[in-house]
Each structure stands twice: as C-alpha cells, then as structure tokens.
A protein has these predicted regions:
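Glycoside hydrolase catalytic-domain context in secreted enzymes
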Residues: 1-230
C-alpha cells in the first residue's frame, strides 16, 4: 500500500520495491506500468488517497523520484535497455487528488499558487527523475479537463519542464470530455486532446476512428501527429 509505505520515509526500500515489481513484471513480458501515482491528496473523502503518498508535496516528491528510478533502473532512459526494467508512468497529471468534496473525476478549483506549489512538485520530481510517460487525469482544473488542456500538456509539461516522453489518457479520458460539456461529440473531443498534446488514447477508440479525418479537415496538424509518434 503506497500510503503505508510513505509513512516509513524509507526511500531506498520504496525504490527497491518498485525495482522488484519491475523485475517480476518484465519477466512476464510487461514493458510498461501505470505507476507511480503521485497525486497529492488533502481530502480524506477521496477514495484513492491510499494509492499516493498523502498530503505533503515534499515527501511526495521524494517518493515519486524513488519509484520512477526503481521501475526504470535509474534516472536515465538508457537504463531502460536493461531487461529487468519497465517504463514508468507518472499519474494523474494533474491535481487529480484535488477533486471537490473528494468526488472522483470532479472539478478542481485551484489558485495558480496552490496548483504550482502544492500539487505540482511530485509531477516535476518524476519528470526530473526521467519518467518516460505521463497519464492525464480525468478531472477539470479551473473548468478545463486535463485531457484537453494545452497549457498543462504542452506549455507547462513539454515547454517549461522539457518533458520528452509521451502522454497517455486515462481510461476513455477523451470520450469523457463530452460529459464535461466542453465539446459536442467524440470527434471534437479527439481534436481537442490531440491539439492539447495527448499522444495516446487509452481504449477509447477516438483517435483510430476520427483522427485521419480531422487531419484532412485541418482540425489537427500533421506536425502534432508527427510529434506524438516520434
């Protein structure tokens, strides 16, 4: 249980536990894990508190680094050539644990100060540790779903932080932007996600169904596609 592990402050054992998990997973042919979850949580009503490190961004950042290095064998992508390592995925970007009233998938209303200084440090720590992938969160941040948030996925993550890996949605995250009422249909949801900087659609089928048409119509640039598959 990650929350229980965090109470120990034993970073080396947390790194080692991730390394053991990577060793066992890779032996079964698994190359990618959807971990670590690094979301800061301040509301005990949220049902996923136990998956993270709790409410302290400093401790959360240390643990994010330890787990990424455990899964990937170090802080350099070259270590992924080792057969005993797996790709790590930093999730859920961003502020998933800030959902109002602890309701999963809910909106998050956050000042820039609170967002950047309280919720963002563990994600940045994972990036600095060399995490290969990020997963977008389901929630809105100040009215904009993370899966369609260009400021979050492109301006902050890639341009400001210099992230060079790829971003995957959470399960049907693109489809669910229709329920957020920010787009009218699945096709528009796919365009919003692609233009925001989402590289992979997890199980939703939106990209495979609509993306070629959206490129032909000029709604999504070929440059965005090239970047996503590079």
């Amino acid at each position: 249980m990650p929350l229980a592990e965090s109470c120990s402050w034993d970073l080396e054992r947390m790194r080692k536990s991730a390394a053991i998990a990577a060793d066992e997973a890779s032996a079964s042919g698994i190359a990618w894990t959807f971990a670590p979850m690094v979301d800061i949580s301040r509301d005990a009503r949220w049902g996923r508190v136990m998956e993270g490190a709790g409410e302290d961004p400093y401790l959360g950042s240390l643990i994010a680094k330890a787990r990424v290095e455990g899964f990937q064998g170090g802080n350099d992508w070259r270590s992924l050539a080792d057969v005993n390592t797996v790709l790590a995925c930093c999730k859920h970007f961003a502020a998933y644990g800030a959902a109002e009233a602890g309701r999963d998938y809910n909106t998050s209303e956050l000042s820039q100060n609170t967002l950047m200084n309280y919720y963002m440090p563990p994600y940045l720590a994972a990036k600095e540790a060399g995490v290969a992938t990020f997963m977008a969160s389901f929630n809105e941040i100040n009215g904009v779903p993370s899966t369609g948030n260009k400021w979050l996925m492109t301006d902050l993550l890639r341009k400001d932080w210099g992230f060079k890996g790829f971003v995957v949605t959470d399960y049907t995250g693109i489809n669910e932007m229709v329920a957020h009422s920010i787009v009218r249909n699945d096709k528009e949801a796919g365009e919003l996600a692609a233009n925001a900087g989402i590289d992979m659609d997890m199980t939703g089928g939106i990209y495979s169904q609509y993306l070629v048409q959206s490129v032909k119509e000029g709604k999504v640039s070929e440059e965005n596609i090239d970047r996503a598959v590079a």
